[in-house]
């Protein structure tokens, strides 16, 4: 069996792992591709310490982002209901539908915080009334907001 070499990835490589991972690869792969193109570095004790420090910083930053998402979720809950005005035809049927972009604009107007419309899931809304939309604020944090559609 061929000897394997341990290297530390300096950027994400699709078949191996992400930045900072220690992986074992064939010597030729490391020597001819990973090392010359700067995608990896040889494993040394100092590099391992750098990786540990970097991972600790990333973990702290991720916890901070998660806490901000939780705080924003509570802010949305205290606001309670967002109102969206749309034109209505006869029989209370809307011209068009209420989209996730409309919900994002209503939330941004009330909270002054940008939300990506792709993170909002809105049911099909074709009538006036109250509805619930789901917002993914973080990988582990979701919120539900009440939407009232008026004319």
Curated annotation (Swiss-Prot):
A GO molecular-function annotation: structural constituent of ribosome
Superkingdom per UniProt: Bacteria
SUPFAM superfamilies: L9 N-domain-like, Ribosomal protein L9 C-domain
PROSITE patterns on file: RIBOSOMAL_L9
PANTHER family reported in the protein's UniProt record: 50S RIBOSOMAL PROTEIN L9
Chain's role: Binds to the 23S rRNA.
Protein name per Swiss-Prot or TrEMBL: Large ribosomal subunit protein bL9
Species assigned in the record: Prochlorococcus marinus subsp. pastoris (strain CCMP1986 / NIES-2087 / MED4)
């Amino acid at each position: 069996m061929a000897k394997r070499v341990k290297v530390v990835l300096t950027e994400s490589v699709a078949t191996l792992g992400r930045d900072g991972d220690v992986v074992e690869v064939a010597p030729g792969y490391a020597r001819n591709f990973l090392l010359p193109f700067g995608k990896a570095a040889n494993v040394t004790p100092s590099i391992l310490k750098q990786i540990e420090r970097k991972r600790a910083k990333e973990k702290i930053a991720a916890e901070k982002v998660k806490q901000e998402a939780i705080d924003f979720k509570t802010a949305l809950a205290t606001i309670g209901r967002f109102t969206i005005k749309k034109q209505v035809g006869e029989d209370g049927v809307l011209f068009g539908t209420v989209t996730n972009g409309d919900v994002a604009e209503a939330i941004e107007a009330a909270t002054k915080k940008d939300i990506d419309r792709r993170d909002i899931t809105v049911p099909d809304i074709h009538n006036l009334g109250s509805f619930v939309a789901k917002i993914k604020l973080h990988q582990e944090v979701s919120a539900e907001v009440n939407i009232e559609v008026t004319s």
